[in-house]
Amino acid sequence: MSDLLSRRLALLGAAANLPLLTECLHGIERECLRVDSDGKLALTPHPRALGSTLTHPQITTDYSEALLEFITPTETDVADTLGDLERIHRFASSKLDGEYLWSPSMPCELPDEESIPIARYGSSLIGRLKYVYRKGLALRYGKTMQCIAGIHYNFSLPERLWPLLRQAEGSELSERDYQSAAYIALIRNFRRYSWLLMYLFGASPALDAGFLRGRPSQLERLDEHTLYLPYATSLRMSDLGYQNNAQAGLTPCYNDLQSYIDSLRQAVSTPYPPYEKVGTKQDGEWVQLNTNILQIENEYYSSIRPKRVTYTGERPVQALAARGVQYVEVRCLDINPFLPLGIDLDEARFLDAFLLFCAFSDSPLLNGECSDATDNFLAVVKEGRRPGLQLQRRGQPVELKVWANELLERIADTAALLDRARGGEAHAAALAAQRAKVADAELTPSAQVLKVMRERGESFEAFSLRQSREHAEYFRQHPLAAEEQARFEKMASDSLAEQTELERDQDGDFDTFVAAYQASILGLISN
């Protein structure tokens, strides 16, 4: 164990401080496509019974009208978070009217690009802005790529913990700056070690052959309708032969919060010539919000983000600049198609131990390690189960299994501390389940997906549809209690009323609204 990690764990293990570890906050966002009874993309509008996608706090859409997003409230116990997620699934499933929630991350057989419906949010100015932003994504990256689903895991340490560490370490940073620096250090370590998550939880080794739209790739054929890589863990997180040149040069520095903010500010205010050629309007219709490298900050694709809850009308980078980092959003997790929620308690508890390890361990600046971190991540998503696979650690080759076991040995200390804080051995058990996967790659979700498909002679689509139907049956057999159902019904109707009120009460025109939105980031740069 590193000196810094051991000192911090000793400090937090003291009787007076141990309860702090029960105050970590968790939230989960789960995306999933709606599909029809044949496993094809649902072309129906978002079900009105689920409420307004603009104003509902827990049920919305991501890119497509058919790409649902379920958002839990924050909880201190991740078991409660998963309980929240299950209740959202049960309610949504009861309103789908013959449609299913698609079980894996990689999409079903998709119609042609033109026919994939972009999510709509009504006629309010903010609703129209969200729609035009998505039109811009289609223009820049294509609609097909936007139909990939994932799980986002939001995690924060208690606010009371940071002053304790700051004082113990004699830091001269302000409390806010110390907290932000600690979260950025967590992110640096996450970049170093996130390949491990891809090995343990990657669940997308195969995809529908039509997904690539005829583009060349390194993928092999499993059957007439399925492409795969034999040792892949997460094709979702690979490049899939897909590159966006505009973002290729955008590598936000995680040396400190300010440099991260500066790189995003620059990207959302720097024109990109190919986008300039298109312009923001065609035939008088908006096609993208602007012609910059990024339309908005959230367009930047990354495996983890520093976050701060925003005020109404505030942009993410403004919130970070004004009040610092509040939590992290882990964005690289595949949906496990064997699980009704796409994630379970073992995974969540391991993530907590892993993120605490990243937060409390020494985290020097990445500098030359950046390319190694990227290369390791890509190697594992494409061939993480290849026997003897070598990764790069500080410029030296190391076998994945050797490094994985060393990391799990160190993460065991944070898991043990979490178990001391909460009682029981749930985190140690979650860690043991991951050790078993390192010992036997056949236990990983990615290997299990291929094993079942081969044993049953199923294509990716057939496997995924069968899992989707099984999950639908699970939710049908476990309906919400009447009181819970009524609460969700009210949430849905309240959200519809809120959207109607928003559309009725607004004034101003859309062009002015977009200009003001763009000016908010330009104003931040000039300050």
From Swiss-Prot:
Cellular component GO terms held in the UniProt record: cytosol
Annotated EC: 6.3.2.2
UniProt-listed InterPro entries: Gln_synth/guanido_kin_cat_dom, Glu_cys_ligase, Glut_cys_ligase
Entry's family note: Belongs to the glutamate--cysteine ligase type 1 family. Type 1 subfamily.
Pathway(s) annotated for this protein in UniProt: Sulfur metabolism; glutathione biosynthesis; glutathione from L-cysteine and L-glutamate: step 1/2
GO molecular function, one term: ATP binding
NCBIfam families on file: glu_cys_ligase
HAMAP family: Glu_cys_ligase (MF_00578)
Keyword annotations from UniProtKB, A to Z: ATP-binding, Glutathione biosynthesis, Ligase, Nucleotide-binding
One GO process term, biological-process aspect: glutathione biosynthetic process
Reaction(s) catalysed by this chain's protein: L-cysteine + L-glutamate + ATP = gamma-L-glutamyl-L-cysteine + ADP + phosphate + H(+)
Protein name: Glutamate--cysteine ligase
